[in-house]
């Protein structure tokens, strides 16, 4: 009984490791250029630094 439980838990862990780490590629632009992530574009487009709240 314990051996079966150990075997099933090991298989479940290996199965999750194999299939849980799928990374979806971001859609590129129409001209094939690589587009940065949304947070990078937001930081570049703002051009100013945030002032700390007092």
UniProtKB/Swiss-Prot annotation:
Disease in which the protein is involved: Defects in PRCD are the cause of progressive rod-cone degeneration (PRCD). PRCD is the most widespread hereditary retinal disease leading to blindness in dogs and phenotypically is the canine counterpart of retinitis pigmentosa in humans.
InterPro entries: PRCD
Keyword Lipoprotein assigned: yes
Composition skew (Basic and acidic residues), residue ranges: 38-54
Processing after translation: Palmitoylated at Cys-2. Palmitoylation is essential for protein stability and trafficking to the photoreceptor outer segment, but does not appear to be essential for membrane localization. Probably palmitoylated by ZDHHC3. Phosphorylated.
Protein's name according to its UniProt entry: Photoreceptor disk component PRCD
Keywords from the UniProt entry: Cell projection, Disease variant, Endoplasmic reticulum, Golgi apparatus, Lipoprotein, Membrane, Palmitate, Retinitis pigmentosa, Sensory transduction, Vision
General function of this protein: Involved in vision.
Sequence segments annotated as region (Disordered): 24-54
Tissue specificity of this protein: Expressed in retina.
Keyword Secreted appears in the UniProt entry: no
Topological relation to the membrane, as annotated: Lipid-anchor
Family from the record: Belongs to the PRCD family.
GO BP terms, alphabetized: visual perception
Signal peptide residue numbers: none
One of the record's GO cellular component terms: photoreceptor outer segment membrane
Taxonomic lineage from the root: Eukaryota, Metazoa, Chordata, Craniata, Vertebrata
